[in-house]
């Protein structure tokens, strides 16, 4: 593993950011102001339409009796989960197939989100999994990466968490789901000091790092996430509650005060 990467997550994300990974000729040809202006204008229109569409969906959710209060709260708190909530009436009654074959064969830590329709409508810890399932989702990402176990989906880990007593009603998951529950899946965890150099050393060994964070950039309460690598711009994080935040880099000095616990995960 080179350049502080667990697998090749950084490269994958760079390709995602640039679309299909190819360079458009307009990206390298200078002086095409007409094209550039058109792109900017279309971007503005697209952004405006998205805002209007999101507001329309939110209004429909809030004015309907088809949505449980917990999902309405989620829609208000997390714009990324808005479409997931909006689709609840039609989707929550379906049986969703979960096939993690592709993710289990990846050479990078897969990103799973709590509000995936395949598992987000299930209940966990007194709430919808979409709102309370960061612990099982985080452990699932680590287990699937380290062991290639395609059966260890977020909702499968949630079921185990409940049976083993790691689910805390109204509060999500206990920290021991990570530090002890991982053994159920053949994964080990060791506590690591909140030190940038030490954490980078673990990542260099190919060990993804699970952190629990308090109020700040990622949560108002408590939250589990996976640190997957680092580069000159900062740490890369798989946030099970945000695809957008998972696509950014995070400087240690900006997140260290929010981190409450650190575990290095390995087999």
Please report, for each region that a protein language model flagged, where it lies by residue.
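Active-site nucleophile-adjacent alpha helix/oxyanion-hole segment immediately C-terminal to the catalytic cysteine
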Residues: 105-160
